[in-house]
Amino acid sequence: MEKSSSSSINPPSLSGDEIREAFINFFVQHNHQKLASSSLIPDDPTVLLTIAGMLPFKPIFLGLKESSTPRATSSQKCIRTNDIENVGRTARHHTFFEMLGNFSFGDYFKKEAIQWAWELSTEVFRLNPQNIVISVFKEDLEAEQIWKEVVGVDANRIIRMGAADNFWSSGATGPCGPCSELYFDFKPELGSDEIDLEDDSRFIEFYNLVFMQYNRDLEGNLEPLANCHIDTGMGLERMAQILQKKSNNYETDLIFPLIKAAALLAQLEYETTNKKNKTSLKIIGDHCRAVTHLICDGVSASNLGRGYILRRLIRRMIRHGRLVGIVQPFLPQLAEMAIELMKNAYPQLLEKKKIILNELKIEESRFLETLERGEKLLAEITSHECDLISGAQAFELYDTYGFPLELTEEIANEKGISVDINGFENEMAKQRKRAKEASVSIDLTEEGSIEREISLFDETRFEGYEKLETTSTVIGIFKNNESVKQAVQGDLVKIIVNRTPFYAESGGQIGDKGIITSQDLEVSVENVRKKKNIFIHSGIVNTGVLEINSSVQMNVTPSFRQRTTSNHTATHLLQSALKLSIDSSVSQRGSLVSNHRLRFDFNAPKPLTIKELEDMEVRINQWINEDHPIQIKTMPIKEAMAAGALAMFGEKYGDVVRVVDVPGVSMELCGGTHVTRTSQLGTFKIINETGIASGIRRIEAIAGPSVLDYFNERDLVVKELSKSFKVQSYEIVERVSSLQLELKDKTKELIKVKNDLALAKALGLASYAKSVGKSKLLIRRLDGVDGSGLQSAASSLIDHLGKYSAVIFGGIPNQEIDNKLVFVAAFSPDLVSDGLHAGKFISGVAKMCGGGGGGRPNLAQAGGSQPQSLDLALEKANENLTQQLS
């Protein structure tokens, strides 16, 4: 293949859509199957988001799955946030980007891949060969030879690179191989003598060809693969920059309309505004595409995993919007434009438009509520002459105001201030410790101190799928976390046996309960956990003597297992119902399966409606009545994933997995216990639905025998209420509503009485006001009055004292809660005109008592938590205000 004549080269200015279409069509003409982009939420539970064009094909490259076609081509949407600090600041970093790719699965190899890459670049996109530089792995002489002798590239334009740059691998072991990259040279007139591909002002990599030809073993040796593969990637945004002759990716038609729209909202001219504003506008444009696609693919904002990535991007958009002067909500408006820009390539954006705009509206509203307060605190911190934001300050911003640490760092860096990251991590660790200590309870399964000894035992053989009783040998006894030969009546013990029917706590399902017996021995088993497949049975010796090496009968309580099993199968049905009734993108975020109930956490942007919950109940109970069989299968993980089995993100799975299949209803990877037919569940009932974090909802439900218990308990409550209120059951709601209205009226009366008392008490203090120059100042401690009462009293005193008057109150509103203080400041209009500000003043007073607050210039309230400092704080307030009024 000869190089094209440079004189005939005139690269067309193609739109982003046209570039995508030209790439796909080129490879379709070369017998590649066109594949749609996969979701940003990958099937691989070990990966958070789709970060590369080849990720959907990873199971094929790793030999875990057969390809349905020998050749494929796609435009894959991707998200990366590892270089988020560079987004908007460099010409080519993005969070969202599209990777155009052509792939061979054991079909063609280097020669065809290289020839087609050159043909596409020079004949379809009509790039001048003089503008193209090739990199190859320094040991890949075959690829270098093809470039020189088959394609005809000048040897001076072929650069040999090391393994760090031009050798791809999927990990420490597995498929790998050299790669070759195509770079566009913006300044070919500089010649080929000293080419530095790291110079991104001159070169941009636009096409990467990976030749998967080796397998690396545990010793690091490279063995040739029986079938070699091709994996390529061309950045759509980069090719758009080249063909549209732009200085950076952001000014292409893929992103620039969003940037211009953001500039319009900020009342800025992008072309003439300063560099800082341009950076913020680029960040907004980039992130807008990312958040739109993330929500479309089912991600909801939260503080965990991919939900945290979405929340972080949304908050960065809002933050940079404010930096350029956009103070009103704007995300839905911009996302609507993003949908319009990308709807041809991704029509699902139109289908999910309502969901996308609603999620952005909710999340923007939430953040705006806290952002202003957080920004004020951060501004106050950085206004003082300091070069470091302490870990405690950064943590307060994170914990109280919802500021991600990265956002605090970004704002601080703009002001040339550092953030104490280690201090922040220490504060975070303290909070985790406090949370852990707050949840400590008596626990018979605290096996941490005996873990080393337990690890010496052979794995326990679990027989609980087939039976609830088995004869076993005691191979380990632990009492007070020490290994012993025997245990007697009353001893709390941990027991290890060679085989067991007891299910050990895992996968969200709690451990079984039951008894261990032999002759005079009886041990109550209260819980079972496992360490590396060694089952630890925790309980108490009721009678007899438990001895090492003795033969015992292991008995799981049948009713306990039945209830737990019913709730576990119901959990699978619930997840399927959620996907069908709410959205197919709903995914599990956590679960608990006990003998009493089930709990299922999932992503959702808003609470479920009563109708949605009712529809799911009806659907699940219909499945129960249809008496579906539950099929348990063990199969290779690649086979299970290919069949559509659901996997829990973050869980680690082996090569062979257990699949729980309700044909036509549900299929999940699961190691838990289940009923054999859905009819055994009897009935399913949702008892609660609530939010546990932003974007995360929780459903609590029951199935099987627990449903009857639930209705019996409710019936008892209704009867007790009927008896107490002396009404029929159907009259209870009306009676409670009447009492609530009565209570509301009485509460209003009580507040009025308290305010009247506070006012009378305060007016009695008017004589204590002192004259300071032409002003009157009253500062007093007033306990037993809440904030609203103090504000009312202070306002009345200002009216009573007249011009140039100031009133400061501080006190303990409730003597039963002596660590809560309230402060109020009121200034007359003339003092406000002279520059005094009640909000700022009272905030300073409250800080002396470990608190804070603020408000309007004429009236403000603050709080505190250190009553021992109250009197001193009021004295200081007197001194400061006297000095100001003088």
Swiss-Prot record:
Catalyzes the attachment of alanine to tRNA(Ala) in a two-step reaction: alanine is first activated by ATP to form Ala-AMP and then transferred to the acceptor end of tRNA(Ala). Also edits incorrectly charged Ser-tRNA(Ala) and Gly-tRNA(Ala) via its editing domain. The keyword Cytoplasm applies. It comes from Prochlorococcus marinus (strain NATL1A). Binds 1 zinc ion per subunit. It is found in: Cytoplasm. GO terms for molecular function: alanine-tRNA ligase activity; aminoacyl-tRNA deacylase activity; ATP binding; tRNA binding; zinc ion binding. The keyword Transferase does not apply. This is Alanine--tRNA ligase. NCBIfam families: alaS. It comes from the Bacteria. Belongs to the class-II aminoacyl-tRNA synthetase family. InterPro entries: aa-tRNA-synth_II/BPL/LPL, Ala-tRNA-lgiase_IIc, Ala-tRNA-ligase_IIc_anticod-bd, Ala-tRNA-synth_IIc_core, Ala-tRNA-synth_IIc_N, Ala-tRNA_ligase, Ala_tRNA_ligase_euk/bac, DHHA1_dom.
